[in-house]
Amino acid sequence: MTLITDELSLPFILKAFAWAFVPYSIICVVYNIFFHPLKHYPGPRLMASSRLPIFFLVLIGKSVNTLEKLHAKYGPVVRVAPDELSFTAASAWKDIYSSSAAWPLAIPRNMVFFRAMAGEYGFHSLVTANNQDHARLRRLYSRAFSKQALAAQEPLIIQHIDKLIKKLYAEIDQTAKPVDINLYLNLALFDMINDLQFGEPLHLLDDTTHRAFARASLIIVPSAAVIQALADFPLARIILKPILREVFRMRRLYFSTTDQRLEKRLASNSYRADIVQFLTDAKSDNISLEEIQANAPLMNIAGSGTSAVALSGLIAHLLLAPHILKELQNEVRSKFRTSSDITMKNMVDMPLLDACIKEVLRVFPAVPVTPGRLVPSPGVTIAGKWVAGGTRVYVTPLAAFHSTDNFHDPETFAPQRWYNTKGENSFASKDVKDAYKPFSVGPYNCIGQ
């Protein structure tokens, strides 16, 4: 008598799996396109049929630019996966990220991305904490980044800026080749935030010892997006493990080095007005050392990489618009006689500088895509449209800021749209300023803006 196990050979199992998988996949595709609750939303049918297209776009780093093109074609809301919608409408910011009567801390977060951002710690960080802990941690860190706290650190900040400028002059004098300003901005700002947080610089501009640590910090955000994408396809993570080995090695390097720097700072028992000192002194807020450890990696990233991107973009756009650069030079030099006059206290009433910073964050957003939220059951209304529960939703800043629905001549770097509100050439009456949220909105917006 033939036993059932004799028939269950590997070829038989593979054939059975294939016969079952193919019709199942066809049924899923048909359902996603024709019967899914999101079937009426515009977007490419290929992306509506499966999560594979958006998965591959995230893996190759093309998702944000593709979303911008899709919004230009399909409008203010695009279905980019069977259960995923991207928005650009101004009202979507409030509907997705702001508080409401039903959701005091906005629509619940999609935690896979945030956990990947924060690393594997036993205690929650600002981006992974529950509502109550988040409010407590945010109050504390907001004070650490207040104007008063930053003013106390102003001499240290100026010291790092002066060092960067001297380094750039030295590099320019030593070579006839172009100097990579973005590289030096990243190094200088990462050095600065480490000094502000741990009370000790890394000397990245002069010493290459810790540059691998600085480079590793730049992959945390994009790798978090990849980890979120891989969560939908566990088998892909196994298959792609050899390719992603270096990415995960750099992640380990970043988190472990941050831990070591924090441990060294805590063991020093010295007093210095840095962020760690501020936090350890705040005993009334009941912040634990484990929570400080969980948040330290985030502070490094938030205080360096995005600022370097914004400054690089500003320099590039000013060089491409020499007439604006000339106006900005006149504004700065008419206000400050010497470099020592440039202080936080004196950096007021500079409308063109303020407008240039706002405009570069629109044209070249440092954070081109916002983390997604997961719509609770049974659903919510976003930008005037009903969205079923279980849908991943977000605003794509790059697409929103470059949308002709929101901004007049959106591809043009035009600082005057932020301060010149009169005259026939004014952008004021043509732009939807509520669509401009470079630091997001709501209880989880950027505390370091």
Feature locations, PLM:
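N-terminal membrane-proximal hinge/A-helix region immediately C-terminal to the signal-anchor transmembrane segment
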Residues: 2-137, 159-163, 167, 188, ...
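Conserved, non-catalytic sequence blocks in retroelement Pol enzymes and Pol-derived host proteins
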Residues: 38-42, 56-61, 147-151, 266, ...
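Structural signal for hydrophobic/aromatic residues that build the beta-strand cores
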Residues: 43, 70, 80, 89, ...
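Conserved cytochrome P450 K-helix E-x-x-R motif and the immediately C-terminal K′/meander segment
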Residues: 57-67, 340-383
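Cytochrome P450 heme-thiolate monooxygenase catalytic core
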Residues: 106-118, 152-311, 327
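Cytochrome P450 heme-thiolate "Cys pocket" and heme-binding signature region
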Residues: 123, 143, 297, 302, ...
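Cytochrome P450 catalytic-core helices
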Residues: 306-331, 449
